[in-house]
Amino acid sequence: MKNSADITVLGAGSYGTALAISLASNGHKTLLWGHDPVHMQTLAQDKCNQAFLPDIAFPDCLQIEADLAKALAASNNVLVVVPSHVFGTVLEQAKPLLRSDARIVWATKGLEPETGRLLQDVARDVLGEQYPLAVLSGPTFAKELAMGLPTAISVAGTCPQFTEDLVELLHSPKRLRVYANDDFTGLQLGGAVKNVIAIGAGMSDGIGFGANARTALITRGLVELTRLGEALGASTATFMGMAGLGDLVLTCTDNQSRNRRFGLALGKGCDVMTAQAEIGQVVEGYRNTKEVFTLAKRLGVEMPITEQIYQVLYQGKSPVDAAKELLGREKKSETPTQ
């Protein structure tokens, strides 16, 4: 079947829109679909996403499509950019409408709610084995990407040709550098764990602990990510790249990060509900914390920072008490995986 579009993007929030803008700016005909028909009609009329990325105009190659069937019929390349807790639901909706030659990539960062499973497992459960899968991950704030500011990400998947094609679609010498990676598991994991550590970094700054404490959290958070990755068979080298250290540093140090701002509010004394309301958008790290904690427990992986953040978010512990418990842990030697 011939493509009438080069790629279809499912998810018209800030990140999905930003990726669609970037793809269309490369000259690729891009369809953007979202679940809310009213929102999609507004996007089509305004030719920008005023709700999430105000005043960033859509390129001519970007087309809005409110009909999921039409969006999926237009291209065999499907980029899913929805919150992790609805990832499986969106795939279920898409499944009967997918083309036989469809190839699925996602930029969703997180794990399956309640189970802590990787999104590749969710995708396989829903879609079966017939479709090539891939993931995009790395240090990207939607606004900067949409504005065309220099950005770098990584892509990995189950099919080398699909990975190569995605690099060609996404890469732009002027705005976006894309690195191919062969660690499908590692790229998915990095995007989930960094959200958790960013909440911790925000809490630390909200309390007023300073740059030393924030840097320690980032560094030891990277150790926790690496431990968990090793338990799942991921490459440790991945976590020194865009989807590991890169995304971790970005999310922990800049207030464009919703997860960091959420943590800041908690550190300043807000309760969880109030802190979430202050952000006004999905805070992926809230659910990610429970998912990562569940996965670590199941695998027997020690993740003390993640555990303390889980206790703050779900068991009512104060951020100050969580910090005290981390500082009071038994002394140990520093090694790459401790």
Curated annotation (Swiss-Prot):
Amino acids binding sn-glycerol 3-phosphate: K109, G138, T140, K194, D247, S257, R258, N259
SUPFAM superfamilies in the cross-refs: 6-phosphogluconate dehydrogenase C-terminal domain-like (SSF48179), NAD(P)-binding Rossmann-fold domains (SSF51735)
Protein name listed in UniProt: Glycerol-3-phosphate dehydrogenase [NAD(P)+]
Family matches, as PROSITE patterns: NAD_G3PDH
Residue stretches spanning the membrane: none
GO molecular function: glycerol-3-phosphate dehydrogenase [NAD(P)+] activity; NAD binding
Organism (species): Shewanella sp. (strain W3-18-1)
One of the record's GO cellular component terms: cytosol
InterPro entries: 6-PGluconate_DH-like_C_sf (IPR008927), 6PGD_dom2 (IPR013328), G3P_DH_NAD-dep (IPR006168), G3P_DH_NAD-dep_C (IPR006109), G3P_DH_NAD-dep_N (IPR011128), NAD(P)-bd_dom_sf (IPR036291)
Annotated catalytic residues: K194
The enzyme's E.C. designation: 1.1.1.94
Presence of keyword Acetylation: no
Superkingdom of the organism of origin: Bacteria
GO biological process: carbohydrate metabolic process; glycerol-3-phosphate biosynthetic process; glycerol-3-phosphate catabolic process; glycerophospholipid biosynthetic process
Localization (cell): Cytoplasm
Catalytic activity: sn-glycerol 3-phosphate + NAD(+) = dihydroxyacetone phosphate + NADH + H(+); sn-glycerol 3-phosphate + NADP(+) = dihydroxyacetone phosphate + NADPH + H(+)
Pfam families: NAD_Gly3P_dh_C, NAD_Gly3P_dh_N
Family listed: Belongs to the NAD-dependent glycerol-3-phosphate dehydrogenase family.
